[in-house]
From Swiss-Prot:
SUPFAM superfamilies in UniProt: dUTPase-like
Name of protein: Deoxyuridine 5'-triphosphate nucleotidohydrolase
Family statement drawn from the similarity comment of this UniProt entry: Belongs to the dUTPase family.
EC assignment: 3.6.1.23
One Pfam family this sequence matches: dUTPase
Keyword Hydrolase part of the UniProt annotation: yes
Residues binding Mg(2+), per UniProt: R28
Organism field: Monkeypox virus
Catalytic activity: dUTP + H2O = dUMP + diphosphate + H(+)
GO BP: any one term: dUTP catabolic process
Superkingdom as given in the UniProt entry: Viruses
Binding site residues for dUTP: P72, R73, S74, G86, V87, I88, D89, Y92, G97, I99, R115
Length: 151
């Protein structure tokens, strides 16, 4: 029922700007793909254990009540490449950059036009926060960090 709280037309296009001729339009690789691939606009070299901000030279407006989540590509994850950060706020209009982290043992090269991450649009809820003295209790309580896993 929360879906109806958001007065949003899911068929409205998301507007984006290619800031340079090096930019490549975000694309989905299949009709059922959750994310739109983002592409590097430049060449980069990322040594093992280092991170690099990768420029896409794309800016866009997020739909109302949505944010963009920058997620890793599974093929890059297999090579030890991960994403740092990863939230594009609804009101952000600047250039989209992707922080790649090389957790692998070899230098990783990014070439112009390489798919570096995927952008997933997700609805967001802006609750009012209320400070209280204590929270209601649950069976789980404060047990976290693997407490519900196998023992």
């Amino acid at each position: 029922m929360i879906f109806f709280m958001f007065n949003m037309n899911i068929n409205s296009p998301v507007r984006f700007v290619k800031e340079t001729n090096r930019a490549k339009s975000p694309t989905r690789q299949s009709p059922g793909a959750a994310g739109y691939d983002l592409y590097s606009a430049y060449d980069y070299t990322i040594p093992p254990g280092e991170r690099q901000l990768i420029k896409t030279d794309i800016s866009m407006s997020m739909p109302k009540f949505c944010y963009g989540r920058i997620a890793p590509r599974s093929g890059l994850s297999l090579k030890g490449i991960d994403i740092g950060g990863g939230v594009i706020d609804e009101d952000y209009r600047g250039s989209i950059g992707v922080i790649l982290i090389n957790n692998g043992k070899c230098t990783f090269n990014v070439n112009t036009g390489d798919r570096i991450a995927q952008l997933i649009y997700q609805r967001i809820y802006y609750p009012e926060l209320e400070e209280v003295q204590s929270l209601d209790s649950t069976d789980r309580g404060d047990q976290g960090f693997g407490s519900t896993g196998l023992r």
